[in-house]
Each structure stands twice: as structure tokens, then as C-alpha cells.
Amino acid sequence: VLSSKDKTNVKTAFGKIGGHAAEYGAEALERMFLGFPTTKTYFPHFDLSHGSAQVKAHGKKVGDALTKAADHLDDLPSALSALSDLHAHKLRVDPVNFKLLSHCLLVTVAAHHPGDFTPSVHASLDKFLANVSTVLTSKYR
């Protein structure tokens, strides 16, 4: 459960991420593919090279979904319901991959906003991403 301080930290962080969400999403995906090569198996039809249009497009989807989640912190299940269905029933993504992408997202945000990435913000974003991951895997049962 996100505390009021966590919610403030997440909203503040996403205020700074703002127009860069698609860029950061793509960068986090690239980090994930490089650091955890087994994650590439879910994207056999993608050009996974640096800067590819497909990775950028998927990064935009990731960024948009996280921005939507940050805008609906008090009702993540409703905000992410369609995405949860997609990942559970059609894509069947192994839940561990959400943790890997979350880690890469944190690294990306820290790299772009080192002065703002305090331990408190780090903890809040980590909780937020864990909550998003929980919602996305909630329909796997």
C-alpha cells in the first residue's frame, strides 16, 4: 500500500518524467533486453537493435501505461484492467519479467534524474512499480 508520502513522490517523479515517458520506457526495455537476454523471447518479431522503431513504440506503450497508473494511484486495478487481461490471457508474460523491467525503469529514471532520485523517491517508485506488477499479474490465476 502506498502511503500519502509515496503517492506524492510518485506524482512528483512522473511530473518530471512527463514528456519523456516514451523515451524512458524504450530505454528501460533496451536495458532489460541487454541485461536479461531471456526477456527477448517475448519479442521474437521485434527488431531489438538500439533505437529500433518497434522498441520505441513498445516503450511508448510502457510509458503511457505507467503514466496512466501514476494518475490513478487509488484505483490501479481499474486503470490497468485491460492491460492485465492482455498480459495474463494473450501474451502470457512470466511475472518475473515485470520485476526485471521495474528494475530497469528505476535505473533509467535514476540515470536521468540523479539529483531527484533520493532514497525516499527510490522506495516510493519501487513500491509503485511493485503494485503495478501485482495488478498486471492478478489475473494469472
From Swiss-Prot:
Question: Where do the Globin domain residues begin and end?
Answer: 1-141
**Gene Ontology process terms (BP):** hydrogen peroxide catabolic process
Tell me which residues bear N6-acetyllysine. Answer: K16
Is Transferase there in the keyword field? no
Superkingdom, taxonomy of origin:
Eukaryota
Residues with the Phosphothreonine modification: T8, T108, T134, T137
Keyword annotations of the record:
Acetylation, Heme, Iron, Metal-binding, Oxygen transport, Phosphoprotein, Transport
Extract the InterPro entries matched here. Globin, Globin-like_sf, Globin/Proto, Hemoglobin_a-typ, Hemoglobin_oxygen_transport, Hemoglobin_pi
A single Gene Ontology CC annotation of this entry is: haptoglobin-hemoglobin complex
Where are residues bearing N6-succinyllysine located in the sequence? K7, K11, K16, K40
Its Gene Ontology molecular function terms? haptoglobin binding; heme binding; iron ion binding; organic acid binding; oxygen binding; oxygen carrier activity; peroxidase activity
Which residue positions does Phosphoserine occur at? S3, S49, S102, S124, S138
Q: In which tissues is it expressed?
A: Red blood cells.
Q: Where does heme b bind?
A: H87
Q: Which residues carry this modification: Phosphotyrosine?
A: Y24
What are the binding positions for O2 in this chain? Answer: H58
> What is this protein for, i.e. what is its function?
Involved in oxygen transport from the lung to the various peripheral tissues.
On assembly, the entry states:
Heterotetramer of two alpha chains and two beta chains.
**What family name appears in the similarity comment?**
Belongs to the globin family.
Q: What name is this protein filed under?
A: Hemoglobin subunit alpha
What gene is it encoded by? HBA
